[in-house]
Amino acid sequence: MPESLPVHVIDDDDAVRESLAFLLESSGLAVTQHTSAAAFLDAGVPLDRGCIVTDVRMPGISGLELLKELNARGAHMAVIVMTGHGDVPLAVEAMKLGAADFLEKPFDDAAIIAAVRASLGRSAEQGRQEDARSEVGKRIAGLSQRERQVLECLVNGLANKTIAYDLGISPRTVEVYRANVMTKMKAASLPELVRMALLAGVAPADDATPT
């Protein structure tokens, strides 16, 4: 559930940070406070799930610099940037760097809660996609070399006879390999198998022509 994902509030202003943390906690969210971007980065927080709410202007590492560092580390966290009046250009720059949203101070309580919940929802969905991609990748790794070749041919939309010709095996043997692939991939249908393969990055050839 999105509510179980962590929310990290980063602001050097104690009053703002504590007030925002209290507001989010009161709405049922799990919140951790950080007095600076450096403190957040030094905390060793997992960067694959959750949401960050950070001020754009902070001493040391600014909100924009934090976004750049998160990108460099391959983070998958939604980032909401808080800006002061007149900081819209900074907010636009933050969005270009991957921020999920920005809110101008003073912000409405309902608006910040809605923004955080929306970001957590996206983070949860992304997490599910990453988990699914990882699981499919493991299944593909369990295929034999020939089974992997048959899988790639199926993704390219090739018929059994064409696969047999391309691989130099009989159509009956292709059927056996195809059944093995379906079983190992735990796919209930060919469309599901293709979707799983595409999710894992098994891309069809540019010149592939279904036959």
UniProtKB/Swiss-Prot annotation:
Localization per record: Cytoplasm
Modification after translation, per record: Phosphorylated by FixL.
A molecular-function term among this protein's GO annotations: metal ion binding
InterPro entries from the UniProt entry: CheY-like_superfamily, Sig_transdc_resp-reg_receiver, Tscrpt_reg_LuxR_C, WH-like_DNA-bd_sf
CC terms in the record's Gene Ontology section: cytoplasm
SMART domains membership: HTH_LUXR (SM00421), REC (SM00448)
Main localization, broad class: cytoplasm
Note on cofactor: Binds 1 Mg(2+) ion per subunit.
Modified residues (4-aspartylphosphate): 55
Residue stretches making up the Response regulatory domain: 6-120
Keywords of the record: Activator, Cytoplasm, DNA-binding, Magnesium, Metal-binding, Nitrogen fixation, Phosphoprotein, Transcription, Transcription regulation, Two-component regulatory system
Gene Ontology biological process terms in this record: nitrogen fixation; phosphorelay signal transduction system; regulation of DNA-templated transcription
DNA-binding region: 160-179
Cofactors required: Mg(2+)
The HTH luxR-type domain, residue ranges: 136-201
Keyword Transcription regulation among UniProt keywords: yes
Binding site for Mg(2+): 11-12, 55, 57
Pfam families associated with the record: GerE, Response_reg
NCBIfam families with a match to the protein in the record: PRK09390.1 (NF006900)
Function (record text): FixJ, when activated by FixL, induces the expression of both nifA, required for activation of classical nif and fix genes, and fixK, required for fixN activation.
Protein name: Transcriptional regulatory protein FixJ
Organism the protein comes from: Azorhizobium caulinodans (strain ATCC 43989 / DSM 5975 / JCM 20966 / LMG 6465 / NBRC 14845 / NCIMB 13405 / ORS 571)
Gene name tied to this protein: fixJ
